[in-house]
UniProtKB/Swiss-Prot annotation:
This is Translation initiation factor 6. One of its GO terms (molecular function) is ribosome binding. Gene3D superfamilies: L-arginine/glycine Amidinotransferase, Chain A. The keyword Protein biosynthesis applies. Keywords: Initiation factor, Protein biosynthesis. One of its GO terms (biological process) is cytosolic ribosome assembly. HAMAP family: eIF_6 (MF_00032). It holds the Pfam family eIF-6. The keyword Protein biosynthesis applies. It comes from Methanocella arvoryzae (strain DSM 22066 / NBRC 105507 / MRE50).
């Protein structure tokens, strides 16, 4: 199932929300009708909470079927809601916007090159994936420069051949380049996707949507 939805009048659904195959995390003040559409489209349960008292959930956290990595500033009451759906680990240090720093699915994670060995070990243990440092399109904020499901990966259009090869080797999935919202290269900022459904903002064009569908495995060959 594929839908185009905006949050708060903006197309950046990947900044205001985060999801795994099982659950989508949404701000408490999002209209219930929108929440219902998101859950139906992605085929997930819903957790409604802020992260670090912020609606920028997609920037502050990431996760997969095994657990969640969140900002070190995440409140206990916020983490407790997530813990009903998996282990929660706080990212320690100065860089805590986990959603910006980590691109993950159920088998692998690419992370910001400056993340510490200790943080990488924590990510490996919580998400139960192989972790590698890297960039996408020269950007260290790989979480916003890409979108990964268990079927495929879409990344920044300026990703180099070397970066694409690293991603394909790490995730063992097809990788393609594309844009969202009429030319934005930060594809992770405007996509929420599982293997069952896909949401992007209303500014994403038809050709962009076709590329997204193809990259994330929604078009059968």
């Amino acid at each position: 199932m594929i839908r185009q939805i905006d949050f708060y009048g903006y197309p950046y659904v990947g900044i205001y929300a985060a999801n795994t195959e099982q659950v989508v995390v949404l701000p408490p003040d999002l209209p219930q009708a929108t929440v219902d559409l998101v859950a139906e489209t992605l085929g997930t349960a819903v957790v409604r909470t802020l992260i670090n008292e912020s609606t920028l959930i997609g920037s502050m956290m990431t996760g997969n079927s095994n657990g969640f990595i969140v900002s070190d500033l995440t409140l206990d009451r916020e983490a407790n809601l997530l813990q009903e759906h998996g282990k929660v680990t706080r990212l320690k240090g100065k860089m805590t916007a986990a959603g910006n720093l980590i691109l993950a699915n159920d088998t692998a994670a690419l992370v910001h090159p400056a993340l510490t060995d200790k943080n990488i070990e924590a990510i490996e243990k919580t998400l139960k994936v192989e972790v590698r440092r890297g960039t996408i399109g020269g950007l260290k904020t790989v979480g916003m420069a890409g979108c990964a499901t268990n079927k495929g990966i879409l990344v920044h259009p300026r990703a180099t051949e070397e970066e694409l090869t690293v991603l394909e080797d790490l995730f063992k999935l097809p990788v393609d380049i594309g844009t969202v919202s009429f030319g934005s290269p930060l594809v992770g900022s405007a996509i929420l996707a599982t293997t069952k459904g896909l949401i992007t903002g209303t500014r994403t064009s038809g050709p962009e949507l076709g590329r997204i569908e193809d990259a994330l495995g929604f078009i059968e060959e």
